[in-house]
């Protein structure tokens, strides 16, 4: 009834118009008075009930009730009222009195004593934050906190149909901290709090992996962000360091969100976000102090926190001090709530080390218990520590160091060198020391290296050595827990090239190479990290699980202070017992070249001055090598580049690949966008200058196992620009997550420059962010190999079935690139091939595509293929690409036109020749000539035909007469000279037998196809004249 009355009174006050007059406290019907009258009414009812039963109620004692404040009214006033405890019947409760103002609160270490309404100090074993609350116990999710897992991608189909949903994704309590999800779901840790006055929220966190988005923001009770600013992005921290974050809170309801979203594009596991010690200031008063949690204590009044019990002690809830364990049979970790029995010792409880060399050059193998020692040797099944003291010969000094007769190795003086087994010697004239470090013998930890151990959840291994030397290798130490980070650091103040290469530009300054192996039975991980100028530690590469002995090289291109870090973690799950103590990593050698403070294992040739007396080394100009005969600087030949590893001898100048040329300083090779190819006695000229600007390809979409949609974005800088790498890929995740740095610092950059680079793009709608996200930018190519029509160059091969066959007869041109950085999956680095194809239907920049069988552009993750189709990839036009067409002759003039061959497979180049006119004879003239000749020929043929016909008739007649005459005279020879002349006929013609043919005879013979004489002697035979 009291609560109902309070709500009604409060509701009536809220219903007052905003501009209406306020009710004075002295009015009998103010909300506070209504509450008081309601309380009095309740007491009267209780009294009436008791009197009606005939049983008088006892007077209320202080133990029978407690005080509370009413809700604040619109004037900021409230009343203190007495509330009977449950199951207590009494009478005579104290009357309501005016309470403290609503914004009142006590200081840290104090609480509000409600009887007198004054602040009092907390007693021993308790603590108070005053007007704040603190969450530092994460054995389970504290009351008021909630987990909400959402999937913000817009994929087709209901979320229930996804093979792997987000229902099991949540923040996980880990004892002293809470850990975020590791997948690509969006999980929010939510806490709602109502503040009586302005305050703040403060928490500590560890956030080292930018493959997870980490946001902290605040909403009101209407689910609206209080301040929609970029401050919600939490900054990255270094490995092992706890950062802090605080945000001001407004009075009223504040809903706090810790939200993480994983961006998983590969197989590597991400490091989760860790949060601890959440403190909220500005809440209502506290009327009591909180008891210290088990494992902590408070030994003085007015404490605002409790201290953790040291190791081998424990405490219960509300303890004033810690109780020691029985040290001979029990132990406890720091902050323990109880002691546990010590287990028997096993082989997992000790490790071996090598002592420094003694004066005899011997080292001892020593066995030590893992500290702190928690096992017992006096139990039945316990093992004892193996005997120590076995002596072995010390390994020699590392290259660049020498032994001066003592038990330690010393660096060689400047200008000298040693292989580690002999004394230091001065470099001969014309040479200089090859500075660097080569650590391959591990008897003691080198001076510029240090080792440590830390754990995000406890301090067991603080002060321990994370790594131990072991003769021919250095190995991970025991640590305090299986999830410890075992740290090994190498500090190098800077890098510089050899003297002869001081003027070179664009080349590497040095490199660090190490040989290692891991032996693991669980999910161990080895991280290799680089810190530049002590500002940002970034993970360069990581290896999980057991790895065979292998080498890894990291190239240095910038002169800065570097700290290289190797961090080894056996497992990411913390447990009380040690299960993976035998999981180790071994590093056999670490080599750093061109270190500023390095030592020399050998000497290398250097260039001498031009003067005869000069004996000191001088730097060569860029692109010059050292001539062996004279030790003088000499420029590399054209189209060669200078090796970044050695400059001695002409062989240091390496020829450029096909179709490429060197820069002026011979630092690298590049394509000037022109290419020439001989084909069938024809030279094809290609001009790719219009494609020299960066070409882009957005490929996808693809989806992760959780369904996150992402795209692969490629940038290609094909040629030109004097070899400058114009393709840039950005990481805009780092715009929100990188640590604060000095303005203008270029130690940490969000841009990746290369010939070919790749970014992973997550669209804005995929994760509910306001802009698309670009992450995981990698260099696919930073070295140009060459350009050729062949499909293979330097072990990069384009298979015939990789792309569709070109419909043209113009050969495709191939640009080949590679990356100088090796990875665990690509030991020889990545390589890229770009196939340029002539396609007149693709004007301008054209279209870039990837193989259909490799939608990500690569089939193995190491070699990338692209097909770039454009009209600009066609060869320049020549005289072979057009032909002429002759027009009709008109009025004595003829027009000659030139047209391109179809289909046209060329661009630009030469232009079509202008049409030209030439003199000619018209068709009418030749028609007339032809008609005349034809008519004459026809008349001649008719005349000849008639002549020969008539001639033939006469001969036939004479022949028949001759035959008839011969038969009638029965073989009498003719008496006349003429043949068959009848009476009345004139002897008009004389028959002359002659072998000579006249002109007409020749024509007749041609007509009758006779080859011999026209008239041959014919012997006529008759049966009656056998003698003839």
From Swiss-Prot:
Acetylation keyword on record: no
Membrane topology listed for this record: Single-pass type I membrane protein
Main location: membrane
Residues of this chain annotated as glycosylated in UniProt: 168, 404, 690
A GO CC term assigned to this protein in UniProt: plasma membrane
Gene3D superfamilies: Tumor Necrosis Factor Receptor, subunit A, domain 2
Residue positions, PTM Phosphoserine: 1017
Protein name (Swiss-Prot/TrEMBL): Endosome/lysosome-associated apoptosis and autophagy regulator family member 2
A Gene Ontology biological process term: negative regulation of nervous system development
Extracellular membrane side: 48-928
Molecular functions per Gene Ontology: BMP receptor binding
Organism: Mus musculus
